[in-house]
Amino acid sequence: MELNLLLVIIILVATYTVSLLNKQWRKPKSQQKQPPKLPVIGHLHLLWGGLPPQHLLRSIAREYGPVAHVQLGEVYSVVLSSAEAAKQAMKVLDPNFADRFDSVGSRIMWYDNDDIIFSPYNDHWHQMRKICVSELLSPKNVRSFGFIRQEEIERLIRVMKQSEGAPVDVTEEVSKMSCFVVCRAAFGSVLKDQGSLAELVKESLAMASGFELKDLYPSSWLLNLLSFNNYRLKRMRRRLDHVLDGFLEEHRVKKNGEFGGEDIVDVLFRMQKDSNIKIPITSNGIKGFIFNTFSAGAEASSTTISWALSELMRNPAKMAKVQAEVREALKGKTSVDLSEMQELKYMRSVVKETLRLHPPFPLIPRQSREECEINGFYIPARTRILINAWSIGRDPLYWEDPDTFRPERFDEVSRDFMGNDFEFIPFGAGQRICPGLHFGLANVEIPLAQLLYHFDWKLPQGMTDADLYVAGTPGLSGPRKKNVFLVPTIHKSR
């Protein structure tokens, strides 16, 4: 719900809410620095201003420190904005911060949190993560999806060639490609309505991002009734159920897909019947995992490609350098596989630098299971934690000239995004690091290499480099505020 509407509703019920706040509010034991807060809304007013929350929370951290207390409505929250604080939460005290906090959007759209992303830290989560890492999205399985990825990239290249010389919505076309890869990897075949499913997922993600009134005032049943988006989310969930139930039933009947082996849904069906599985896998659990794959896989991958192209267009020398590398390494080849990505060292640095500046998960949500301390500050049990990965990736303590796109920095200092370097955590770290990291990365690197290999790019008439620099919007995958439109020209040497 729009923040201005949120303010109006909160003011209308201020008297009622204040009485609840007096009962519910607990002050931390330590005297943490915190911004001035207002009655009823706490620090919500600091998150109004048109910028994504990670930008605004960085401003708070600069003034009040890397472990900052913010009160969002009646909910006590802590924002971590340094590599040291993130390391405490995601390594030193990892089990204590391995929980996710509940929200209206996640509970409705992620099937009562019966998934991997938003599931509580319990036996169900451990089981699903193990299945995901060892069976569903293992490096071996990611390689087996190679022919699907290549076919969808070839479709993308054809679309670009047909549009040569005219502006193309690159963001939209890359998003379709990513969604179709995920769809075919999940269901083992081209689905009749996979385009509709992709659009439905995008719409669902946009609607489910952010906090509802009930999230900010959990003790108020009245505000829950006034959360109109709650009803919209439930309608969207019913639409998603209808589509996914149809696809799953069709899959049960057809069984074998284009793999000739198991696709993601096949594995989940097999595990559902496995008598050795300790915790039964429900139909909602299967649908939740599929929605996970779309939301954290397809959307995050396509968003990263869009950001990479934007940064390269704003830096022509970097564009020339990476295209020269790609065209030399892939000369004469009709397809590209994961093994060949190892040769493209500068292009991989371009991807890393894009992930540093524009992490797919800019704010990483956690929740403390027990009371503890981080950097000397007391954290009560069941405190909501927001780790600002976006801010950490731009911290001048760790990065020289942090707001500048400079892929060469990764040639100078070895840093990876596998959760070992806490100044660079685009996929999180610890036990809850993104389990689909390898799948998502393949869906970024290979399509980006092909787009750089086949085409020269320029801006549409009337656009300047400055038009490409836009802040992201609130959302699970840090999406851009505006789509990227570019004009492709087939590379002359081809």
Swiss-Prot record:
Signal peptide stretch: none
Pfam families: p450 (PF00067)
Cofactors demanded by this protein: heme
Main subcellular location of this protein, as a coarse class: endoplasmic reticulum
InterPro entries hit by this protein: CYP450_71D, Cyt_P450, Cyt_P450_CS, Cyt_P450_E_grp-I, Cyt_P450_sf
Record localization: Endoplasmic reticulum membrane
Protein name: Cytochrome P450 71D94
